[in-house]
Every structure is written in C-alpha cells, then in structure tokens.
Amino acid sequence: MASWDFIVIGGGIAGVSAAAELARSGRVLLLEREERLAYHTTGRSAAFFTMNYGNAMIRGLTAASGPFLTKPPDGFAEAPLMSPHPAVTVARHDQDTAFETNLAKATASSGNIVEISPGEAEAMIGVMAPGYVARAHLEPDAMAMDVDLIHSGFRRQLTARGGEITCRAEVQSLRRKNGLWQVATGTQTFQAPVVVNAAGAWADEVAGLAGARPLGLQPKRRTVILFAPPEGVDLRRCPLVIDCEELFYFKPEAGIVLGSPADETDSPPCDAQPEEFDIARVVERIEAATTLQIRRLAHKWAGLRSFVADRTPVVGHDPEIKGFVWLAGQGGYGIMTSPAMSRAAATLATGNAWPLDIAAHGIHAEDLSPARPSLA
C-alpha cells in the first residue's frame, strides 16, 4: 500500500492549489474522480477578479489573494494570470435601494470603486438600452482571470515539488487505522495520516465515507451562454456589466459575449447541464437591458457553486474526526481566493502559524473553521 503524508481528494482549483502548498511540507497525492482535472466547477467558471463580490470573508480572502495573482512566483505561468477589465454595476430606477446597498458594500471593500453617471456608464458599455441605467458604479481595477493558467500553474507547482496526481480515482471508502487513513478507490488503496477533502459539490459525500458529519453543503447551478454580438458591434472594450441585484451579467469573451442570469438553483452533486428556462431568462434580461438581440447561441453550459449556510468557505480540521481536513464551500469564489485559501488549508493541515497577511485582512482560522457556530 503506497504511503503519503497528505492525500487531497478533488482536482479542482481548491484541491490542486492546496496540494501544491502542502507539497512544501511532505509527500502529497492528489486523487480526482474524473478523467481529467478541473472537469466540474473550475473548468466551467466565468472567472473574474473583483472586490465587489461575496460577503466580508470572501472579500478579505480575495484581497489577500490579489498580490499572488497579480505577480505570481517565477515559473508559475508563461503569461500574466490576469488582465485589466473594468466592471460596471448598473441599476434601473426601481432598484435604487438595492443599488445603495451594493455601493456601500463595494466602497467598503475597495477605495477605487466610484459612482459614475448614467451617461458615463452608457458610453463605456455602448449597448445599454436608452433610459435603462438610472445609477451605476465603476470598479476600474477589476481583472479578467485566466483560469487555465492559474490551475495549470498550481498543478506545475505540485508536481515540481514531488507531488503526484491520479485521475479516474473515485474514493469509495475511507478508514482510519493505526493513525493512518486508508483511502480506497476501487483499484488501489493509499494511506496517509491526513486527508484533505476538496471534493467540491461531493464534499459532504466524501465526509460521510470518513464518518464525519456533513456541513449541509448545497450545490447551486449557474448557467452561462455565449453569443455573437450583432454585425458591426465591437464589444472588445466593453466592461463586465452586472446588475446590482445580480439578476444578470455579461462581458466580452474572445470576440463574442458571455452572459449569465446569475442563477442559484439548488442541485444535487452532478455533471450540471443548462436548463432551457435559465437560458431563456438570461436572454430576456440581457435583451431588456441592452440593444443586443440574441438570435443564436454559440455555446451554453452550467456549473455547480457549492455553499454552506453562512456562504463562507470551510477550511480546517474536522472537530470530531482526526486527520480529516475540510476545504469546501467556496461557492463561486474559489478561483479568485485560491492563493489565500490554499495557504490557509496547508497551514491548518500542518499546524503552522496562521499567515499574517491573511490575518491583516481580518480573516482568522476560527472564521473558516468547520466548528464555527454559524454552521451549527
């Protein structure tokens, strides 16, 4: 039976980044149930780096991740991980209260977010329906993220530090014996004193195999469409446009347009597929807000974003099951928080001191703990 210091379950951004960090401290094996890494949520993300997204914990983790994503270590990637892409939040006349709430949270998170006039927003976007925008604010330093580069960079770190990856390795049993977890995949069994549960939408199911209590993790489906703009309409310089109540967003994507109804439909863990109702909803909302007419879709897909009750990620040792570390509930924020989250997970798994830069953003181990009162 092959032995390791750490076994990480799940090959999305959470598992790969945590495994790369853990490989600084010991021998790491990453297990992925699918044929390739990042098949589910990570590989379907419309990732964007913004300080105006998520609750206070998410915003702190995002801020702590910014320096890494802006200037990664030498050799991490062959190109920049992010590129400038401003974001404009818009509101109709009947959304004034929601806009005020959004603006207050936004300006508390970033001093660079400012309110702009409807005319300025319309000029920046270029395709808003006349009279639609009553208020707007601008995040000038938001960024587009290259998900593939970020994920492959962590994978490269993992293997360079001696870590190994095994795909088509769905965990079927977890048994602790003589201080070691025996992790059986059906064809092989591996052992390690510490297991990190980064199984995404399946994290509660993996926990059940270990005898741990579930977190009450709820996967939620998010739908995305791609469509071509009308002939003669150039949206390459268009910002990310998002409704102040997250009823829709759209942005340019490699010469076409990516849009979403920002849906959060409860789902079991699965290979998520888009529903026609959600596709119709995003088409209707974007057409109502803009001069765009969506005649044909270039592509459509869906992914799962998994949350616990307080919508804050869960990182740390299970309070009852020795050697079982949670790394789950990232919601839709896993990529932009991955540098900070991976260091938090590795710190807690190894018992090292909490990172000072993460603490400086108001995030402490107890805030992410699976034993925190808000999960009771």
Task: Give the residues covered by each predicted segment.
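Beta1/beta-strand and adjacent pyrophosphate-binding region of the FAD-binding site
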Residues: 1-14, 29
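C-terminal lid/capping helical subdomain adjacent to the catalytic/cofactor pocket in oxidative enzymes
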Residues: 2, 320-376
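Short hydrophobic core segments
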Residues: 7-9, 190-202, 342
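Active-site substrate-recognition segment that forms the wall
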Residues: 17-22, 49, 71, 77-86, ...
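Glycine-rich FAD pyrophosphate-binding loop
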Residues: 23-42
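Dinucleotide-binding Rossmann-like beta1-alpha1 core, especially the glycine-rich loop
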Residues: 46-124, 247-249, 285
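Helix-loop-beta segment of a Rossmann-like dinucleotide-binding subdomain
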Residues: 78-89, 103, 109, 114-161, ...
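Helical element adjacent to the flavin cofactor pocket in flavoenzyme catalytic cores
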Residues: 137-193
